[in-house]
């Protein structure tokens, strides 16, 4: 039994060391507090020097407003701050720090020296604390306007805490992550980082979008920016802007996710759910999206004082914020088209972007052997003299929709087609070439090879057609249900009694999905109607898979919540299969539909549907021009 002990008031030192357990976990915690103080002081330049991963030394110098001599003793006192004076200030706090605990907690577990000046004549003052009972002495110390805080020998007086520190490399990695997060929060501030005497980063300040993108590329890597889409959405007092990576740039870990609320880096469950929901339709299972996003809203509508390290926040209207983030990202991802990706690719290669003609309306045959140079609905090939000498082919413009209707393309994929021999592209102005170019050939019955203005396009035809079918089915379902087509001869399938019961229980849902099923026995179903868009699918297996999904999700409410998963299952059955030989017109029609379809860069499972191998990249493979 624990003996009864008297209640005693803790000493200032012990109280601060206990508080340090929440505030100071490792060197990265110290750097976070010091940098936030500098940013709150109005600094436009931060110089950070680290030794031994921050365990031996952390020094931060800024050019902010500095601290008055008379305020220096208070700077290291607990619950002393210049950022809030009363409760009303806390409800709309705009600074990163406000509790007045950081320096007191740090100085209780490390050797801390603070030098500051508020004047331009380099007349500064220094205060030192080394884990003592808050006894500090002030002495003159030359220093330009601003503040330098030096922290040495972290946890030197608390061995139990020190033994929990990891290796120098691990601690430095955590520290570097903190610097990166803060560098992304303030593009208008220059950051310079040195470790063990070696310059690591030197990020210049800049406010233009080009300078911001340069900072993001430096912090997150150029590959992120190559695959990122800039978004900016506003609704009332809410504004969301930043960069989101395309789903094909997903990550195995959630290590490239930066979200800021009024400039404060946070990790919030509500935000994470909204982002995850926006990506769920295009992200491969087990993968994580990458993004750098900034949410701006009225400070009085968000509470930042709910977590010791201020990583979590609480919104006054959770549902409004969640739906705004979700709808903004969902809309942005849906609007990404192949020409957007190709334009960024060209920019990264230092090229102009000719040929990026969204929804080009002048498709043309690429090969000889199609009815004397033409196919249904398209004018015969003619040759017009070019201004550069020689000849170039000319074509009659026809809309993609007309071509699709008149040549009965891949919607009738099982129809017979005459073989077509592909040959080289005629030389035509690049502005006539649509984003995904024109088909050249089919590889192994799986991939479509096409040429566009920049190089070679490779398309996974099943994945691409699956996405197109899926998006059409979602649109039809949202407008009242899928159109149905009766079977000339109803098809009978044997099912379990549970599956037959499910078909009867959810008959209305099946009808909305375009099916008509009739129970013909305890374990028998008749398929009388199928969705028109899936008229070439294998009816029996399609119905079995939909039944399986409905049984898995159970109630009608859950089924409606997971309806996209069911539609994705159906779309997979209705899409062109591997080893199906397509004609050149069919391939071109598929490319045009990809250009006009939302989220066509990924299949329903999040895998990419196409990629570009630029001419420069091909030249490098063959070492041309080297």
UniProtKB/Swiss-Prot annotation:
Residue runs in coiled coils: none
InterPro entries referenced in this protein's UniProt entry, alphabetically: DNA_mismatch_repair_CS, DNA_mismatch_repair_MutL, DNA_mismatch_S5_2-like, HATPase_C_sf, MutL/Mlh/PMS, MutL/Mlh/Pms-like, MutL_C, MutL_C_dimsub
GO molecular function, one term: mismatched DNA binding
PROSITE patterns assigned to the protein according to its UniProt record, in alphabetical order: DNA_MISMATCH_REPAIR_1
Keyword tags: DNA damage, DNA repair
PANTHER family with a match to the protein in the record: DNA MISMATCH REPAIR PROTEIN MLH, PMS, MUTL, DNA MISMATCH REPAIR PROTEIN MLH1
Protein family according to the UniProt entry: Belongs to the DNA mismatch repair MutL/HexB family.
HAMAP family (UniProt xref): DNA_mis_repair
Protein name: DNA mismatch repair protein MutL
Species lineage: Bacteria, Pseudomonadati, Pseudomonadota, Gammaproteobacteria, Cellvibrionales
Gene name per UniProt: mutL
């Amino acid at each position: 039994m624990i003996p009864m002990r008297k209640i005693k008031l803790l000493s200032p030192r012990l109280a601060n060391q206990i508080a340090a357990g929440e505030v100071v976990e490792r060197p990265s915690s110290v750097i976070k507090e010091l940098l936030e103080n500098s940013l709150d002081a109005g600094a436009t330049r931060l110089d950070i020097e680290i030794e031994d991963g921050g365990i031996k030394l952390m020094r931060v110098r800024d050019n902010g407003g500095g601290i008055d001599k008379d305020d220096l003793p208070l700077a290291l006192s607990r619950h002393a701050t210049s950022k809030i004076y009363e409760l009303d200030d806390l409800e709309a706090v705009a600074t990163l720090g406000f509790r007045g605990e950081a320096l007191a907690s740090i100085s209780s577990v490390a050797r801390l020296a603070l030098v500051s000046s508020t004047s331009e004549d380099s007349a500064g003052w220094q205060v030192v604390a080394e884990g003592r009972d808050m006894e500090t002495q002030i002495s003159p110390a030359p220093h330009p306007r601003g503040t330098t805080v030096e922290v040495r020998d972290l946890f030197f007086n608390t061995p139990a805490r020190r033994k929990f520190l990891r290796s120098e490399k691990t601690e430095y990695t955590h520290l570097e992550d903190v610097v990166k997060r803060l560098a992304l929060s303030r593009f208008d501030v220059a950051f310079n980082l040195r470790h063990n005497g070696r310059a690591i980063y030197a990020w210049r300040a800049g406010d233009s979008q080009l300078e911001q993108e340069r900072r993001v590329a430096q912090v997150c890597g150029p590959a992120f920016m190559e695959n990122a889409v800039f978004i900016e959405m506003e609704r009332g007092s809410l504004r969301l802007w930043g960069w989101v990576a395309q789903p094909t740039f997903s990550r195995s870990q959630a290590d490239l996710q930066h979200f800021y609320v009024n400039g404060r880096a946070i990790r919030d469950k509500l935000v994470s759910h909204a982002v995850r929901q926006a990506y769920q339709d295009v992200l491969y299972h087990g993968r994580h999206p990458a993004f750098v996003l900034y949410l701006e809203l009225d400070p009085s509508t968000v509470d930042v004082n709910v977590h010791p390290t201020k990583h979590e926040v609480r919104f006054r209207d959770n549902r409004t914020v969640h739906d705004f983030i979700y709808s903004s990202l969902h809309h942005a991802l849906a609007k990404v088209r192949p020409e957007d990706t190709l334009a960024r690719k060209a920019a990264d290669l230092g090229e102009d972007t000719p040929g990026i003609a969204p929804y080009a309306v002048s498709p043309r045959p690429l090969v000889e052997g199609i009815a004397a140079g033409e196919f249904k609905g398209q004018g015969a090939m003619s040759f017009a003299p070019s201004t550069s000498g020689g000849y170039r082919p000319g074509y009659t413009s026809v809309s993609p929709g007309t071509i699709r209707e008149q040549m009965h393309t891949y919607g009738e994929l099982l129809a017979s087609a005459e073989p077509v021999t592909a040959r080289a592209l005629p030389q035509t102005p690049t502005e006539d070439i649509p984003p995904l170019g024109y088909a050249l050939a089919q590889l192994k019955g799986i991939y479509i090879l096409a040429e566009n203005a920049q190089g070679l396009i490779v398309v996974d035809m099943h994945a691409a057609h699956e996405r197109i079918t899926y998006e059409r089915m979602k649109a039809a379902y949202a407008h009242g249900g899928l159109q149905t087509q009766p079977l000339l001869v109803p098809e009978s399938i044997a099912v379990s009694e549970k599956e037959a019961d499910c078909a009867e229980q959810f008959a209305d849902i099946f009808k909305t999905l375009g099916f008509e099923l009739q129970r013909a026995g305890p374990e028998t179903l008749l398929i009388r109607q199928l969705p028109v868009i899936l008229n070439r699918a294998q009816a029996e297996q399609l119905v079995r898979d939909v039944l399986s999904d409905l049984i898995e999700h159970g109630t009608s409410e859950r089924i409606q919540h997971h309806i996209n998963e069911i539609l994705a299952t159906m779309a997979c059955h209705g899409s062109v299969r591997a080893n199906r030989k397509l004609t050149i017109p069919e391939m071109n029609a598929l490319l045009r539909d990809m250009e006009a379809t939302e989220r066509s860069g990924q299949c329903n499972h999040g895998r990419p549907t196409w990629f570009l191998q630029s001419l420069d990249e091909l030249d490098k493979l063959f070492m041309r021009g080297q």
